[in-house]
Regions:
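Conserved beta-strand hairpin/beta-sheet module of binuclear metal-dependent hydrolase folds
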Residues: 1-47, 123-142
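Active-site metal-binding loops of divalent metal-dependent hydrolases
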Residues: 8-10, 32, 37-40, 58-59, ...
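Structural motif
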Residues: 32-33, 53, 108, 136-140, ...
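Active-site metal-binding motif and surrounding structural segment of the metallo-beta-lactamase
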Residues: 37-80, 159-163, 168
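Short amphipathic alpha-helix with an adjacent loop that forms part of the alpha/beta core around
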Residues: 44-48, 69, 102-107, 151-156, ...
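Metallo-beta-lactamase
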Residues: 79-135, 242-252
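Cap/insert and terminal regions of metallo-dependent hydrolase folds
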Residues: 147-250
């Protein structure tokens, strides 16, 4: 699978600051499937007519933008059924999904997992995705703080080649209320440490838990807040021991 980070910023990136800018977090898979996205990422897509499907993690405006749907229509839109019925854009074919079940998207096999996030819609279920294709797989986990228990148990069935995590709050910034629905870089370090090595010594009833991340699997940070991170070069330097701090336009092969 070929991935491009169309956007890597949180909601507080509104306009370019000092020549550097992050569009709202969005990912392009094999040139045809998007995860989230606002109209601000259109310039990076190249050929909007090539987009066949969009997967939505949740309905926040920095992730779901009807203007983007209008620009790439006709398109299939995959959203959790708790809010999928509210998407009414001409040319958008809405395909609801449930959590903890697999579904096919343009030749990819996708599983939606419940995430620790919330929106103005109290009834909405927000999600992360496991995406599989060509014998490879990755985990896309933004927005959301930590991992819910159901999500963790679902991940135990996976052997992931890569992961992308919400890292809204920077390494050297004090935690605030956002840790209840977003990660700090330190939180991601703890999560990834367990995904790589689930067992810290023997346990009488939980033996045999294998790593979720394959050896050498790379971890990418996205959804970086403008007000809660230093310059990109500084982020890249402080995270180089375990992560890749993604920036808009980064392309990777999984």
């Amino acid at each position: 699978m070929r991935l491009m980070f169309l956007g890597t910023g949180a909601a507080d990136w509104v306009e370019p600051q000092d020549g550097f800018f992050r569009a709202n977090a969005s990912l392009l898979i094999d040139g045809r499937v998007m995860i989230d996205g606002t109209a601000g990422v259109l310039a990076r897509i190249g050929d909007p007519s090539a987009i066949t499907d969009i997967l939505y993690t949740h309905s926040h405006r920095d992730h779901y933008d009807p203007a983007l749907l209008e620009a790439v229509a006709p398109v299939r839109v995959h959203a959790h059924r708790s809010w999928a019925g509210e998407i009414r854009v001409p040319g958008a074919e809405v395909v609801p999904f449930d959590v903890l079940s697999d579904f096919d998207v343009a030749g990819l096999r996708v599983t939606a997992l419940p995430s620790n996030h919330s929106t103005e819609r109290a009834y909405e279920t927000t999600v992360h995705f496991v995406v599989r294709g060509g014998g490879r797989s990755f985990f896309y986990a933004t927005d959301g703080a930590w991992l819910l228990n159901a999500e963790w148990h679902a991940l135990l069935r996976e052997e992931l080649d890569a992961a992308v995590f919400d890292a809204t709050v920077g390494e050297m910034y004090p935690a605030d209320y956002r840790i209840f629905e977003h990660n700090t870089v330190g939180m991601v370090r703890l999560i990834v440490g367990v995904l790589r090595n689930p067992m810290n010594g023997p346990h009488p009833t939980h033996g045999g838990i294998r790593p979720v991340l394959k050896p050498g699997a790379k971890v990418y940070l996205t959804h970086l807040a403008r007000t809660l991170h230093p310059a990109h070069e500084e982020i890249a330097k402080t995270c180089a021991d375990g992560f890749v701090a993604a920036r808009d336009g980064l392309e990777i092969e999984i």
